C-alpha cells in the first residue's frame, strides 16, 4: 500500500495550484494524499466550484475515492485508482476556468490506456487563468517537443461572470518523453495583437489596438466580434513569436476601466518579458515543471520565478523522485532537473 502524502494548502502561493498539481501527480503515481488549509491564502478559502469540478473530474477519470469533496471544504483526502482513457464531459456551473480543470486531468491521460477527449464548460476568459489560445499556441507546441500530443479547441467563449464557455482537448498516451531545452528567446520574428469583443463596442477594441501599436511594431492587428450571448466581455492579447519560442500575453477588460488602461497593463507585462533574454515567461514556467519532471530531464530559463512556479516544484518533488535546481545569473534564472 502506497504511503499517504500530507500537504499543507497554505504553502507557497496558498491558492489552488497546490491542489491541482497534487491531483495530477496522485493520478499519475497512484499515491494518495491529504491536503489541509485548502486555498488558505485567498479571501474566500476552501473549494470553489472550479476546484470542486477538478476534484470530481480527477476522481471520475481514475476511479478515486474522495473525502471532503464539497463546496467550501478546506480538507480533502484523495485515494486514486487506475486512470482510464475515454470521453469525458465536466461542467463547472460558474465562470470558473475551463483550462485549469483541463490542466488538472490531462497529465494523467498521458498515461491512459488509450486516446481521450475531455470537454469542460465554464469560463474561458478569466484574468487568473491561461486562456485556451495560450494552451493551443504556446504550451502545446512545447509539449509536442517533449513527446506529449494533445490538441485543444475553444468551442465557445464564456466571459466572467456569466460563463457558458466550452473548451475541449483531445489527447493521446505518451509513447516516450523527450528532453526540453529552452534557453534564450532569440530575435523577435513578429508580434501579433488581438482583441476579442462580445457585446462591447468595436471602438473599445480600436483604442486597445492603438495603444499596443503605440508601443510595439505589430505585424498583425486582429479584432474579433463574438456573438453577444457569449459576453459581455473583452480580452486583449499580444503574441510574441521569437526564433526559439512563441509566447502569448493577455489581459481581460473590466467595467469602468478605460480601453487605454487595459491595454497599457498588457504593454507593461510584455515589456517586462522582453527586458530579459530568457525564453520562458512567468506563467508558462508554471506549466513546464510537471512535463519536464516526467521526462526526468530538461531545463529552461525564466526572468522572474513566480511563487506559483516554486510551489509547483515543491509539490512535484513530493510525488516524483526528481530534484529541481534554480540558479540565478544576471537577472535570469535557470530551472533544471538536477
Curated annotation (Swiss-Prot):
PROSITE patterns, per database record: RTC
Transmembrane segments: none
Tagged with keyword Transit peptide: no
Catalyzed chemical reaction(s): a 3'-end 3'-phospho-ribonucleotide-RNA + ATP = a 3'-end 2',3'-cyclophospho-ribonucleotide-RNA + AMP + diphosphate
Subcellular location: Cytoplasm
Entry keyword set: ATP-binding, Cytoplasm, Ligase, Nucleotide-binding
Active-site residues (renumbered): 308
Keyword Transcription: no
GO biological process: RNA processing
SUPFAM superfamilies documented for this protein: EPT/RTPC-like, RNA 3'-terminal phosphate cyclase, RPTC, insert domain
Residues the record lists as binding ATP: 103, 283-287
GO cellular component: cytoplasm
One of the record's GO molecular function terms: RNA-3'-phosphate cyclase activity
EC number: 6.5.1.4
Domain of life: Bacteria
Family from the record: Belongs to the RNA 3'-terminal cyclase family. Type 1 subfamily.
PANTHER family: RNA 3' TERMINAL PHOSPHATE CYCLASE, RNA 3'-TERMINAL PHOSPHATE CYCLASE
HAMAP family, A to Z: RTC (MF_00200)
Function: Catalyzes the conversion of 3'-phosphate to a 2',3'-cyclic phosphodiester at the end of RNA. The mechanism of action of the enzyme occurs in 3 steps: (A) adenylation of the enzyme by ATP; (B) transfer of adenylate to an RNA-N3'P to produce RNA-N3'PP5'A; (C) and attack of the adjacent 2'-hydroxyl on the 3'-phosphorus in the diester linkage to produce the cyclic end product. The biological role of this enzyme is unknown but it is likely to function in some aspects of cellular RNA processing.
Name used for this protein in its record: RNA 3'-terminal phosphate cyclase
Protein's organism: Escherichia coli O8 (strain IAI1)
Amino acid at each position: 500500500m502506497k504511503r499517504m502524502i500530507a500537504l499543507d494548502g497554505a504553502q507557497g502561493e496558498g491558492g489552488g495550484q497546490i491542489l491541482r498539481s497534487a491531483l495530477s501527480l496522485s493520478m499519475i503515481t497512484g499515491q494518495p494524499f491529504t491536503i489541509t488549509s485548502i486555498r488558505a491564502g485567498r479571501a474566500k478559502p476552501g473549494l470553489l466550484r472550479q476546484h470542486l469540478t477538478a476534484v470530481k473530474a480527477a476522481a471520475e477519470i481514475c476511479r478515486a475515492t474522495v473525502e471532503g469533496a464539497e463546496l467550501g471544504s478546506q480538507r480533502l483526502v484523495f485515494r486514486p485508482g487506475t486512470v482510464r482513457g475515454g470521453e469525458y464531459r465536466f461542467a463547472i456551473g460558474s465562470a470558473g476556468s475551463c483550462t485549469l480543470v483541463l490542466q488538472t486531468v490531462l497529465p494523467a491521460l498521458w498515461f491512459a490506456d488509450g486516446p481521450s477527449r475531455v470537454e469542460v464548460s465554464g469560463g474561458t476568459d478569466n484574468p487568473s487563468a491561461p486562456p485556451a489560445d495560450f494552451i493551443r499556441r504556446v504550451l502545446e507546441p512545447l509539449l509536442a517537443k517533449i513527446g506529449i500530443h494533445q490538441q485543444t479547441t475553444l468551442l465557445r467563449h464564456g466571459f466572467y461572470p456569466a460563463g457558458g464557455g466550452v473548451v475541449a482537448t483531445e489527447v493521446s498516451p505518451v509513447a516516450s518523453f523527450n528532453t526540453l531545452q529552452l534557453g534564450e528567446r532569440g530575435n523577435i520574428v513578429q508580434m501579433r495583437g488581438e482583441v476579442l469583443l462580445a457585446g462591447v463596442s468595436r471602438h473599445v477594441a480600436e483604442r486597445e489596438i492603438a495603444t499596443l501599436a503605440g508601443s510595439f511594431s505589430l505585424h498583425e492587428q486582429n479584432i474579433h466580434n463574438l456573438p453577444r450571448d457569449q459576453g459581455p466581455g473583452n480580452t486583449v492579447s499580444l503574441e510574441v513569436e521569437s526564433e526559439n519560442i512563441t509566447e502569448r500575453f493577455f489581459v481581460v477588460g473590466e467595467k469602468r476601466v478605460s480601453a487605454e488602461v487595459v491595454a497599457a497593463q498588457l504593454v507593461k507585462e510584455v515589456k517586462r518579458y522582453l527586458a530579459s533574454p530568457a525564453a520562458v515567461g512567468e506563467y508558462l514556467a508554471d506549466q513546464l515543471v510537471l512535463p519536464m519532471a516526467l521526462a526526468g530531464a530538461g531545463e529552461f530559463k525564466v526572468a522572474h520565478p513566480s511563487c506559483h512556479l516554486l510551489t509547483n516544484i515543491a509539490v512535484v518533488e513530493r510525488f516524483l523522485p526528481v530534484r529541481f535546481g534554480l540558479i540565478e545569473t544576471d537577472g535570469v534564472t535557470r530551472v533544471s532537473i538536477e
